[in-house]
Amino acid sequence: MFKRKSTAELAAQMAKLAGNKGGFSSEDKGEWKLKLDNAGNGQAVIRFLPSKNDEQAPFAILVNHGFKKNGKWYIENCSSTHGDYDSCPVCQYISKNDLYNTDNKEYGLVKRKTSYWANILVVKDPAAPENEGKVFKYRFGKKIWDKINAMIAVDVEMGETPVDVTCPWEGANFVLKVKQVSGFSNYDESKFLNQSAIPNIDDESFQKELFEQMVDLSEMTSKDKFKSFEELSTKFSQVMGTAAMGGAAATAAKKADKVADDLDAFNVDDFNTKTEDDFMSSSSGSSSSADDTDLDDLLNDL
């Protein structure tokens, strides 16, 4: 059941999580999402809940890569969730090609994406009142994550008091406000309210009811949820095509593709109607030398 925990313990758990940035999990019915109106605005009151396991943090961090290229999708969990950047073909592709510094567009497409997960109690949901009083998984971004951290990482010397927002007795409700700003969802007005206990939390039967609705978030990041490097590499190559080779190999492959396209476009009928004089005149000049140079370059690249 629920136990009181120190804010220092929560701070240590969150710091450990932050070191292993983690983002993909498929859609499931246990996830709560704020319903927005036609203008893209919405609000609700939620309560972040503690972990089901006292030894684990009340949050989970997932990293994924999700993008579409050459008409194909790549959506997979990234091993950097566990601090392992070598077992992800996309991370290797980014690193080997130094995409962050050399190709901002490509980097923006394939970069790691981080999502944060928590168990929450829905306190007030005006757009879907049937959710009130129920426990769900909730996925959120860095803006809200920073607001949670700000409640813990306070300046004690200045008289500020750290708050474990997940504590059922001394935590705080969170007012989630989303507004559409320049085409994007903005969470700036979201905030924690004053510390308060969850109503009826001292009732053991109520505690049990909440506890049984919660999920073990550690299962979301367990290594059996991540595919092998070989399997991911195959998928990545299928999506990326020759670009997955990187460097000179990719350039050479593009040249080879162009040669193949040129051969496909060759008109045999035109060839059959050319006279001996046509061939003699077309062979003069520097075109033959240029073609030989291109071919040499292609072979060298390969």
Curated annotation (Swiss-Prot):
> What SUPFAM superfamilies has UniProt attached to this entry?
Nucleic acid-binding proteins
Give a yes or no for keyword Manganese in this entry: no
Instruction: Please give the residue ranges the record annotates as the region Disordered.
Output: 273-302
Comp. bias regions, Low complexity: 280-290
Recite the UniProt keywords alphabetically: DNA damage, DNA repair, DNA replication, DNA-binding, Metal-binding, Repressor, Viral DNA replication, Zinc
Q: What residue spans carry the region label LAST?
A: 3-7
Lineage, top-rank taxon, reads: Viruses
UniProt: Zn(2+) binding residues: 65, 78, 88, 91
Its GO biological process terms?
Answer: bidirectional double-stranded viral DNA replication; DNA recombination; DNA repair; DNA replication
Task: Select a single GO molecular function from the record's annotations and give it.
Answer: metal ion binding
Which InterPro entries does the protein's record reference? NA-bd_OB-fold (IPR012340), Phage_T4_Gp32_ssDNA-bd (IPR012339), Phage_T4_Gp32_ssDNA-bd_sf (IPR044947), SSB_T4 (IPR046395)
Biased composition range(s): Acidic residues = 291-302
Q: Assembly and partners?
A: Homodimer in the absence of DNA, monomer when binding DNA. Interacts with the DNA helicase assembly protein; a ternary complex between the helicase assembly protein, the single-stranded DNA-binding protein and ssDNA is an obligatory intermediate in the helicase loading mechanism. Part of the replicase complex that includes the DNA polymerase, the polymerase clamp, the clamp loader complex, the single-stranded DNA binding protein, the primase, the DnaB-like SF4 replicative helicase and the helicase assembly factor. Interacts (via C-terminus) with the viral SF1 dDA helicase.
Q: Which HAMAP family match?
A: SSB_T4
Query: What role is this protein assigned?
Result: Single-stranded DNA-binding protein that participates in viral DNA replication, recombination, and repair. Coats the lagging-strand ssDNA as the replication fork advances. Stimulates the activities of viral DNA polymerase and DnaB-like SF4 replicative helicase, probably via its interaction with the helicase assembly factor. Together with DnaB-like SF4 replicative helicase and the helicase assembly factor, promotes pairing of two homologous DNA molecules containing complementary single-stranded regions and mediates homologous DNA strand exchange. Also promotes the formation of joint molecules.
Domain writeup:
The acidic C-terminus is involved in modulating the ssDNA binding properties. The N-terminus LAST motif is involved in the cooperative binding of the protein to ssDNA.
- The name of this protein is Single-stranded DNA-binding protein
**Gene from which the chain derives:** 32
